[in-house]
Amino acid sequence: MRYFKIFFISWLLISLISKSFSKDFGTEEEAKNMLERAVNLINYDKIYALNIFTERKGGFNFKDLYPFCADASGILTGHPFNVGFDLLTFIDSDGKNVGKEFLQVAQVGKINKVTFKITYPKDTIKTKDKEYEKTALVTRVGDQICAVGYHNN
């Protein structure tokens, strides 16, 4: 009986931790749905869409998910915190040029994946200065390269 209690308490703790994580972080399916909605909005009105993405409005702020877009040269044109940032300078801890890969894999009508590592600042409550693996779903729509990233772990 004692082992059952230990097992049950351990299972309960793991279950609570995993549910807490899933509430904070979006899934691949949720990211894909958001990217598809973002593409539709860009096709309808690009300027309006980029403003909505930057302001994180219109349902484009779900858990930790948000769409972002860059022009063909890699400059972010729609992003909640980094409009004007050059994606080509985004290099992860493994030395991978993430921005360059975004530009290379983006194709009209197709969603491709770019996986990379990212560390968040210590003052971010969810992350506590831990490195995470993320995957961005990337596509091209008109003259924009757009993506939504989700955590893998």
Q: In which residue ranges do the predicted regions lie?
A:
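Extracytoplasmic ligand-binding sensor domains of the Cache superfamily
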Residues: 60-109
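Soluble sensory domains of the PAS superfamily and closely related sensory modules
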Residues: 35, 45, 98-122
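Bacterial N-terminal signal peptides
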Residues: 7-15
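N-terminal signal peptide c-region/cleavage motif recognized by signal peptidases
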Residues: 17-20
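Bacterial N-terminal signal peptides that target proteins for export
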Residues: 1-7
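Extracytoplasmic/periplasmic helical hairpin
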Residues: 42-69
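Extracellular/periplasmic ligand-binding regions of membrane signal-transduction receptors
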Residues: 25-51
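Sensory/regulatory domains in signal-transduction proteins
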Residues: 112-153
